[in-house]
């Protein structure tokens, strides 16, 4: 089973909470096992943990991590690092390599990322080579890597499950032990 984790850099609690939450929600939905937040924001952690509690799955969130240490440990354990931005190799040109990784850390920034990230990453990947949202970059990249498979999975231990319907909203409240 492929392991994917997202590392969020440069999160500014007062400015970026909504976007960082959406980055985490997107990563969870599209197959990442967890998110590492290289800032201190317990509110983000609480929000994402609440979603996991209600909607299921095993997504984890670590707060206030040392990004250099996390990257070092990930690579020492055989993982690869992909930094998403608007600079670098075009995503379509590197998708097959990313798909072949068993252990992939995806790095996205909020504010300007430290220049050393470009050196620490195995790939610096451009998603469109134009200004864009990090939420979009994560979504497009994870979808390309997984060929849409995460969109078909069921989240285990969910309190709530949406029933797909052409019209209307149907949510099932699941009984849990």
UniProtKB/Swiss-Prot annotation:
InterPro entries, per the entry: Alpha/beta_knot_MTases, tRNA_m1G_MTases_N, tRNA_mtfrase_aTrm56
Catalytic activity: cytidine(56) in tRNA + S-adenosyl-L-methionine = 2'-O-methylcytidine(56) in tRNA + S-adenosyl-L-homocysteine + H(+)
GO biological process, one term: tRNA nucleoside ribose methylation
Enzyme's top EC category: transferase
Gene Ontology MF, one: tRNA (cytidine(56)-2'-O)-methyltransferase activity
Keywords, in A-Z order: Cytoplasm, Methyltransferase, S-adenosyl-L-methionine, Transferase, tRNA processing
UniProt xrefs under Pfam families: Trm56 (PF01994)
Enzyme Commission number(s): 2.1.1.206
UniProt: S-adenosyl-L-methionine binding residues: 84, 109-113
Entry's Gene Ontology cellular component terms: cytoplasm
Keyword S-adenosyl-L-methionine part of the UniProt annotation: yes
Function as written in the Swiss-Prot or TrEMBL entry: Specifically catalyzes the AdoMet-dependent 2'-O-ribose methylation of cytidine at position 56 in tRNAs.
Protein family: Belongs to the aTrm56 family.
NCBIfam families: PRK03958.1
Listed name of the protein: tRNA (cytidine(56)-2'-O)-methyltransferase
Source organism (scientific name): Methanosarcina barkeri (strain Fusaro / DSM 804)
């Amino acid at each position: 089973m492929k392991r994917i984790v997202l590392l969020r850099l440069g999160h500014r609690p007062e400015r970026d909470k909504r976007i960082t939450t959406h980055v985490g929600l997107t990563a969870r939905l599209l197959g990442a096992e967890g998110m590492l937040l290289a800032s201190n924001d317990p509110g983000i952690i609480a929000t994402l943990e609440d979603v996991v509690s209600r909607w299921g799955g095993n997504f984890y969130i670590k707060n206030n991590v040392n990004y250099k240490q996390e990257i070092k440990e990930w690579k020492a354990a055989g993982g690869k690092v992909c930094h998403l931005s608007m600079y670098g190799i075009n995503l379509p040109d590197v998708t097959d390599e990313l798909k072949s990784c068993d252990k992939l850390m995806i790095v996205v920034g909020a504010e300007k990322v430290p220049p050393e990230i470009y050196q620490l990453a195995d790939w610096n990947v451009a998603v469109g080579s134009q200004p864009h949202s990090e939420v979009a970059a994560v979504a497009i990249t994870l979808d390309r890597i997984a060929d849409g498979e995460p969109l078909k999975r069921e989240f285990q231990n969910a309190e709530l499950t949406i029933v797909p319907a052409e019209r209307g909203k149907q949510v099932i409240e699941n009984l849990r032990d």
